[in-house]
Structure formats: structure tokens, C-alpha cells
């Protein structure tokens, strides 16, 4: 059985720690800083770090990779089309990778970066998704390299995963994302309830993750481009009609960039 724990890093990053409690083996996702992982391993000396999964090349996701690889000999698995330090296994759309006895499907999800990948598995009792900086709780990543024509379909693919899928994204952006979601859909009761719930969690310094695909479908404006009110708000922002899901998404993303 795999357990998943968040190791906070920097101001708002989460390094996800996967633990095989039976074999005392673990893996991490997007270790932008080696420190939190080193401290956990030092406190749990009987555990072995076997794998490092990377979603994209930004330094706050790969900054600790080489040191951890040198310290532990862990296998580094990352996107084939990006420069990932110490990468041992290059992964692209349709590939599969076994980690701690769990098989993950690799999904190409370009937009935030061109080579960005996500890791999905439906083998655990509850499916799990490591979405990096593509899909956030109630939001999505900025398009630093890709285009709306790439990112909107990528998000739609993630939204089509089973609704019970637990979403482990890489940043604690949920509250600010929900403020934007409220501006887009001020009458959406699910958004309002989630905003209240997350406000309480963060006031207690508690993590707001994981999310679920089902909850994202109800509250994430970037997955709700087919909703009439969402389109109307996007049209108001742009000053003209947006006649495709991609156009609505692009309008929302440009609005969020300045929100």
C-alpha cells in the first residue's frame, strides 16, 4: 500500500513523498529542494529512496534532483523533451513507469512548459494524479512556453480522468485560485463552499491538497469553459465573443494573469 505525504518547500511548493510501508522504500515527485527530502530520510534511516519523478524542468521542481541522486542512487524519471538534471529514464506520452510497485501512465500535458508531463495511476483503490504545474486546485499553471491551443486540450484530458482521482499538484495556490473562481462564477455554490473550507484550512496552516477531479470539475473555471456563465465572463473580460473552448480558456488565463 502506498501512502502519500507532502514535504513543504520554499514558500508554497509541495514535494510529494510516496511511501511503500511494507518494503520501507519511497519516491519523491518534483524535489525542487533536496533539504526537506534529506531531513525526512535522516529521520527515517531505515527507508530507501528508490525513485525521483519529475514533471517539468523549472528549477523549483528539479533543483534538488542531482544532490538526491548522488546521495541515494535513486532513479530519475522525467520528461523526454526537456533538460532534466541526472535523468535516467526519459518519458513521453503513452509511456508507463513502475514506481514502488505501482504502474503510472505518462501523459503529455504541454502549456506551462512544452515538455510537461503528468503521472496517473488507477492501480490504487483511489486513482492518483501528479499534475505538476499544469492542473492546480481550482486553477492551472501559467503558459510560460505553450499556447492555449496546447494547454486547454491538456487540461480537458485531465478533467476526463475518473472523478474520484486524487489530484496532487505542486503548489499551495488554492485560496488565491478560488478568489479568481469566485470572480468568474459568483453564484456557483460549490466555489463558495470550497472557498470557505480552504480559508479555514489555511487559517490553521493546514494543506488544502489533494483535490479530486470531481471537485475540480465543479469549481475550477479552467475546466468549465463550456459553462454559460464562464463564457459570459470571459466575453466581458475580452470585450468580444469567444467562440471555442480554447478561446474561452485563453481569455480566462489572460484575466487570471492580471487578477
Swiss-Prot record:
Binding site for Zn(2+) 1: 56, 58, 112, 133
Pathway(s): Secondary metabolite metabolism; methylglyoxal degradation; (R)-lactate from methylglyoxal: step 2/2
Essential cofactor(s): Zn(2+)
Binding-site positions, Zn(2+) 2: 60-61, 133, 171
GO biological process: methylglyoxal catabolic process to D-lactate via S-lactoyl-glutathione
Alphabetic keyword roster: Hydrolase, Metal-binding, Zinc
EC class: hydrolase
Pfam family, one: HAGH_C
EC assignment: 3.1.2.6
Example GO molecular function: hydroxyacylglutathione hydrolase activity
Source taxon at top rank: Bacteria
SMART domains for this protein: Lactamase_B
Cofactor note (record): Binds 2 Zn(2+) ions per subunit.
The UniProt record lists the keyword Transmembrane helix: no
Catalytic activity: an S-(2-hydroxyacyl)glutathione + H2O = a 2-hydroxy carboxylate + glutathione + H(+)
Protein's UniProt keywords contain Metal-binding: yes
Family: Belongs to the metallo-beta-lactamase superfamily. Glyoxalase II family.
HAMAP family assigned: Glyoxalase_2
Function summary: Thiolesterase that catalyzes the hydrolysis of S-D-lactoyl-glutathione to form glutathione and D-lactic acid.
Binding partners and assembly: Monomer.
Name of protein: Hydroxyacylglutathione hydrolase
Organism from which the protein derives: Pseudomonas putida (strain ATCC 47054 / DSM 6125 / CFBP 8728 / NCIMB 11950 / KT2440)
Amino acid at each position: 500500500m502506498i501512502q502519500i505525504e507532502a514535504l513543504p518547500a520554499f514558500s508554497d511548493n509541495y514535494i510529494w513523498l510516496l511511501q511503500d510501508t511494507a518494503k520501507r522504500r519511497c519516491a519523491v515527485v518534483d524535489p525542487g529542494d533536496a533539504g526537506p527530502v534529506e531531513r525526512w530520510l535522516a529521520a527515517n534511516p531505515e527507508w530507501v529512496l528508490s525513485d525521483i519523478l519529475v514533471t517539468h524542468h523549472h528549477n523549483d521542481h528539479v533543483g534538488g534532483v542531482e544532490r538526491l541522486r548522488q546521495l541515494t542512487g535513486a532513479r530519475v524519471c522525467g520528461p523526454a523533451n526537456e533538460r532534466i538534471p541526472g535523468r535516467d529514464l526519459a518519458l513521453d506520452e503513452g509511456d508507463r513507469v513502475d514506481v514502488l510497485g505501482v504502474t503510472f501512465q505518462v501523459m503529455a500535458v504541454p502549456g506551462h512548459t512544452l515538455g510537461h508531463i503528468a503521472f496517473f495511476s488507477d492501480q490504487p483503490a483511489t486513482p492518483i494524479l501528479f499534475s505538476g504545474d499544469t492542473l492546480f486546485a481550482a486553477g492551472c499553471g501559467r503558459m510560460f512556453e505553450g499556447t492555449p491551443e496546447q494547454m486547454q486540450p491538456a487540461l480537458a484530458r485531465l478533467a476526463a480522468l475518473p472523478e474520484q482521482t486524487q489530484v496532487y499538484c505542486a503548489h499551495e495556490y488554492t485560496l488565491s485560485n478560488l478568489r479568481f473562481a469566485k470572480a468568474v462564477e459568483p453564484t456557483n455554490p460549490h466555489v463558495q463552499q470550497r472557498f470557505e473550507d480552504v480559508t479555514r484550512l489555511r487559517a490553521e496552516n493546514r494543506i488544502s491538497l489533494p483535490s479530486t477531479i470531481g471537485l475540480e470539475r465543479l469549481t475550477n473555471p479552467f475546466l468549465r469553459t463550456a459553462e454559460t456563465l464562464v463564457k459570459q465572463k470571459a466575453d466581458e473580460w475580452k470585450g468580444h465573443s469567444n467562440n471555442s473552448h480554447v478561446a474561452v480558456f485563453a481569455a480566462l488565463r489572460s484575466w487570471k494573469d492580471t487578477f
